[in-house]
Swiss-Prot record:
Name this protein carries in UniProt: N-succinylarginine dihydrolase
Signal sequence, start to end: none
Assembly and interaction partners: Homodimer.
Family: Belongs to the succinylarginine dihydrolase family.
GO molecular function (one): N-succinylarginine dihydrolase activity
GO biological process: arginine catabolic process to glutamate; arginine catabolic process to succinate
EC number: 3.5.3.23
Enzyme class: hydrolase
Residues reported in the UniProt entry to bind substrate: 19-28, 110, 137-138, 214, 252, 362
Keyword NAD annotated: no
Listed pathway(s): Amino-acid degradation; L-arginine degradation via AST pathway; L-glutamate and succinate from L-arginine: step 2/5
Organism (species): Aliivibrio salmonicida (strain LFI1238) (Vibrio salmonicida (strain LFI1238))
Amino acid sequence: MKAVEANFDGLVGPTHNYSGLSVGNIASKNNKAGASNPKQAVKQGLEKMKALHDMGFVQGVLAPQERPDIATLRRLGFSGSDANVLQQSHQYSPQLLAACSSASSMWTANAATVSPSSDTADGKVHFTPANLINKFHRSIEDEVTGNILKATFADEKHFSHHEALPHSDYFGDEGAANHTRFCNEYGEQGVEFFVFGKSAFNDRYPAPKKYPARQTLEASEAIARTHGLRDKFTVFAQQNPDVIDQGVFHNDVIAVGNKNTLFCHQQAFLNQEQVKSDLSASYGSGFNVIEVPTDKVSLQDAVETYLFNSQLVTKSDGKTLIILPQHCRENPRVWAYLNELVEQKRGIDELHTFDLKQSMQNGGGPACLRLRVVLNEAEQQAVNQQTLMNDMLFSTLNAWADKHYRDRIEDKDLADPQLLLESRAALDELTQIMKLGSVYPFQR
């Protein structure tokens, strides 16, 4: 059955702010305490979604989390009315309030790991929400993420939903940001590629020294088992710990794959030649590796421009398009390399850039903003159709953002009870627009 690779992008939430919460993410740290513009951020994301829809791709929308997360703040000892909880947390632990107000769920590459039905033992699409235990502000997402995924992919005949892995450092899981899939055609058996930063139980694997490795081998293996993947078509590889220490906090900051092509930096993986050999052996003939040499694009340029945090997509005419942040065009070395790559006809045919400044300043490029879901025709019909981008949804969500979102948020605004009310009103209306039901705690 013919299949497509759909992209489900996360809507930026109403509390989008720059709190510098993500250790190891240089852009997040460098923009800490700056004023954010949630309305601009959500509209930049919507523009990207609409552009992909207009190019002929199946484009979906995933709802954001409820923030500030009052329930978590109450678990941490703050009490009284919601306004009192905000006031107390701002007074005694502003860092906690910032963490519980993060709009980081916009980066749906971390929402879950997804395996298509052509790869799984039971012939269903499998979803496992990421536990994201390495960062507190993201570790409180997985329950609601699961609710949103179940409301988006509700038909049990086609979709299987798992709980997040245990909330332990042994099973640190960052979702699809450390996972990609290679295939000849999307609806055929593919090779699922899991990249980890460390092993929890086996000290023969080196670990980074400066920044944390967020994904463990054990987590990746558990997801492969849970999804019923075939060993022959599953490859595990370790990310180079030295590049983690230089700001490559997820594999999707240093590599991206699509169909038969792996586009990666020369320093992306530990034992890189063996990784390429393992992938080629599992894939078979025709596997294409575009390895970017350090003397063409330095690691620093790769991280600063988010060259590899791009989307590789296949157009209906068979050509491969790479969707890049505007930062790549603005860097002469990176832009020269990309144009040279297209001229060489090595597997990337066209370049397209987007202005995603609000997301980029918090450390997330085009690939961070999307969760890839391969769907055959029957599965596409089984998806909640109100979550799929079209002209009407684009118009509706822009009007919704104009109605509910602020155009400026600073740290002090997170304690404003009115922001909580605005956020809940926005999400309540959103669940009606997208027919999600009661996915948020405040709706119960």
